Amino acid sequence: GLYDETVKVGRRTMVLFFIIDTSGSMRGAKIGQVNAAIEGILPKIKEISKENADAEIKVCVLNFATKAKWVTAAPVSVEDEAYRWEYVEAGGTTALGDACRELNEALSTKTFMKEVGGSYAPVLFLMSDGEPTDDYRSGIEVLKRNNWFKAAIKVAIGIGNDANKSMLAEFTGSDESVIEVH
């Protein structure tokens, strides 16, 4: 009949960015907490994505130590059976400013935010003990001019008892968006 035909409606994309401090100060238990948390949450995110007819959730991972480095070359669907969390290891200095500049490049319709069906505002998870060794403020200032960053949901997760919450709040824009993990 008239209503028997099914038409697949395009899904918009929501990109979750994990920006992970992999510097030497994150060695041991701290980086272990990060790996366990992300590995534990990905199956739940996958389930949410599969159950949502309107949005597909994709993830991007940006590690930063002495320099920032994308682990994922582009957003990866959490529904992709081949995608697995790759444990990160810690070592080096803390180039958060470099990570902010890399993130700024990715938050563009020319790169990571170019889905044909459109994109929801991204979600940014910064995971760090909050002790940058570079000029991170200039990187954050660049990000603050980016429209995707302005629209993004920003959460900073302070790892360890000594996490610098005020620095993490500079990234999110508010103290309320900083969560501590001990």
Short names for language-model regions:
Residues F18-S23, V34, V61, L103, ...:
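DG-centered beta-turn motif at the end of beta-strands
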Residues R27-G28, P132-S138:
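Extracytoplasmic/secreted cell-surface and envelope-processing proteins
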Residues G24-E56:
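…and closely analogous acidic/polar surface helices at protein-protein or active-site interfaces
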Residues R84, N161-H182:
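Von Willebrand factor A/integrin I-like adhesion domains
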Residues E56-Y83:
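Short, charge-patterned binding micro-sites
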Residues G1-F17, T22-G32, T109-V116:
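Acidic, polar low-complexity linker/tail segments
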Residues K69, E81-Y120, T133-D135, I153-S166:
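Von Willebrand factor
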Residues K50, K144-A152:
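Arginine/glycine-rich "motif VI" loop of SF2 helicases in the C-terminal RecA-like domain
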